[in-house]
Regions:
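A general secondary-structure junction signal
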Residues: 74, 244-246, 327
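Alpha-helix boundary/capping residues
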Residues: 24, 41, 63, 94, ...
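Glycine-rich ThDP/TPP pyrophosphate-binding loop and its adjacent helix/strand module
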Residues: 117-314
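Short acidic, gly/pro-rich beta-turn/loop elements at beta-sheet edges
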Residues: 80-82, 188, 252, 322
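Conserved acidic/glycine
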Residues: 1-56, 254-329
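Cofactor-binding active-site loop characterized by glycine-rich and histidine/acidic residues
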Residues: 32-35, 40-172, 193-196, 201, ...
Length: 329
């Protein structure tokens, strides 16, 4: 098992760099707008923002192919946008409107898209991990070469069902990538206060699952690690663990004042390690884009996000009859 530090790959072309920049910026601006709408009362219930962690899902989606699947926890808006789900439908679902992906009944934590192979959004910590293995088992049974990206956090990594899943996935050599989004805090509990193993990916060793730590504030490093993990799974070698070390700028949820860390800590990460600023710098210094080019992209992204907010506001609330549909248990 190895640990990977941030790297700036010179063989990445302009189109790829611009794609990463656009995708990460869309997630950042979308989440900022969602936070605003929550404050205005348009979005209710739980709302967990992905601000700061954008490079994780954008880098891994760049490693995915058509037909690959993804499943995650409650901090899921970024994953939806990164796999190509419509911002209008995502924002409308956040607002509990009929135009949302789950007809306004799922909200922030419980929407999905079969068309994009996005299987949720799950509110129970760690519960999505065995489901991800199940998705991978279906692909192995069908004898295709699809891969499932199963995302969970450093807090969920302490849940028992995760290790039951590791054992089964290794035993059956399932094509599943276990993605540990280590943002340093499980709600308000620092990782160092909740685990005696600072490198969570090493826990796979007992199940003969290879893995590595990745700089999650560098989208190029994430893409490189994602390519390696995907190749491993498609070759029929079984599961792979990526512990992607990242950082969330906002609280655990909109109701979290985040008093367990200092403002200076957050500001230091923003100033020195921000993934979007990192790619922006590469684009400019490498002459892949000009300041005007990036301003044009920023303007385009803001327009998309503002339109998603207006769509959500204009979309009606679900009809009363929807209370009785889509019930299976």
């Amino acid at each position: 098992m190895t640990s990977r530090k941030g790297s700036k790959k010179s063989n990445v072309n302009t189109e790829e760099l611009l794609s990463y920049y656009k995708d990460m910026l869309l997630i950042r601006r979308f989440e900022e707008k969602a936070g605003q709408l929550y404050g205005m009362g348009l979005i209710g219930g739980f709302c967990h923002l992905y601000i700061g962690q954008e490079a994780v899902v954008v880098g891994l989606e760049a490693s995915a192919e058509a037909g690959d699947k993804r499943i995650t926890s409650y901090r899921d808006h970024g994953h939806m946008l990164a796999c190509g789900m419509d911002p209008n439908g995502v924002m409308a679902e956040l607002a509990g409107r009929a135009g949302g992906y789950s007809k306004g009944k799922g909200g922030s934590m419980h929407m999905f898209s079969k068309e994009k192979n996005f299987y949720g959004g799950h509110g129970i910590v760690g519960a999505q991990v065995p489901l991800g293995a199940g998705l991978a088992f279906a692909d192995k049974y069908l004898e295709n070469d699809r891969v499932t990206f199963t995302y969970f956090g450093d807090g969920a990594a302490n849940q028992g069902q995760v290790y039951e899943t590791f054992n089964m996935a290794s035993l059956w050599k399932l094509p599943v990538i276990f993605v540990i989004e280590n943002n340093q805090y499980a709600m308000g509990t620092s990782q160092l206060r909740s685990t005696s193993t600072p490198d969570i990916y090493t826990r796979g060793a007992g199940f003969d699952i290879p893995g590595e730590a990745v700089d999650g504030m560098d989208v190029l490093s994430v893409k490189e690690a994602g390519d390696k993990a995907v190749k491993h799974c498609r070759a029929g070698k079984g599961p792979y663990i990526l512990e992607i070390k990242t950082y969330r700028y906002r609280g655990h949820s909109m109701s979290d004042p985040a008093k367990y860390r200092t403002r200076e800590e957050v500001q230091k990460m923003r100033e020195e390690r921000d993934a979007i600023e990192n790619i922006r710098s590469i684009l400019l210094t490498g002459k892949h884009a000009s300041e005007d080019d990036l301003k044009s992209i920023d303007k385009e992204i803001k327009k998309i996000v503002n339109e998603s907010a207006e769509f959500a506001k204009a979309s009606p609330e679900p009809e009363l009859e929807e209370l009785y549909t889509d019930i299976y248990a």
